[in-house]
């Protein structure tokens, strides 16, 4: 599971997901990618499930890049515990994703295989996503509908 090796502060505020992604919104390594269409938190196990779905479909060919990393800790208090008495224990790690962020990239496989692998991966993610090519994003179609 993805998580930071060490962190300065074990517990964080929830923060906000307002606005669009200003960084990580271009395809840099691969030929095709998944772009988020809405803001969400993506858990480490969801990222891993999407990666496994893609790599199993493309078998031995191609290369996959994971462009997000779960660096935000999320805490929960146990069931039936009253309010107060401090913040809850660390439960899991999430990657904060804004609209327009490229989540995964893939290359080295034919177009139909790449698009199907990315489509399978989008079903493992909690937010609406679309499959795009490098030409789509460079051609000015980066704005969402």
Curated annotation (Swiss-Prot):
GO BP terms: translation
- A single GO CC term, please? cytosolic large ribosomal subunit
Give GO terms: molecular function aspect only: rRNA binding; structural constituent of ribosome; tRNA binding
Pfam family for this entry, one? Ribosomal_L16
Q: Which SUPFAM superfamilies match?
A: Ribosomal protein L16p/L10e (SSF54686)
InterPro entries xrefs: Ribosomal_uL16, Ribosomal_uL16_bact-type, Ribosomal_uL16_CS, Ribosomal_uL16_dom, Ribosomal_uL16_sf
Keyword list, A-Z: Ribonucleoprotein, Ribosomal protein, RNA-binding, rRNA-binding, tRNA-binding
* Stored PANTHER family: 50S/60S RIBOSOMAL PROTEIN L16, LARGE RIBOSOMAL SUBUNIT PROTEIN UL16M
This molecule's function is given as: Binds 23S rRNA and is also seen to make contacts with the A and possibly P site tRNAs.
The molecule here is called: Large ribosomal subunit protein uL16
Which species is the source of this protein? Agathobacter rectalis (strain ATCC 33656 / DSM 3377 / JCM 17463 / KCTC 5835 / VPI 0990)
């Amino acid at each position: 599971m993805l998580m930071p090796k060490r962190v300065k502060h074990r517990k964080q505020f929830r923060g906000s997901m307002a606005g669009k992604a200003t960084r990580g919104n271009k395809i840099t390594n691969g030929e095709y990618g998944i772009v988020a269409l809405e803001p969400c938190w993506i858990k480490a196990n969801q990222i891993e499930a999407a990666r496994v779905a893609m790599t199993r479909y493309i078998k031995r060919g191609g290369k996959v890049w994971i462009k997000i990393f779960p660096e935000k800790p999320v805490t929960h208090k146990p069931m039936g515990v009253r309010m107060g008495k401090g913040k809850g224990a660390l439960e899991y790690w999430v990657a904060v994703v804004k609209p327009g962020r490229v989540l995964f990239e893939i290359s080295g496989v034919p177009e139909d295989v790449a698009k199907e692998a990315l489509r399978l991966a989008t079903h493992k993610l909690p937010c609406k996503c679309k499959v795009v090519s490098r030409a789509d994003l460079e051609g000015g179609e980066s704005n969402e509908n």
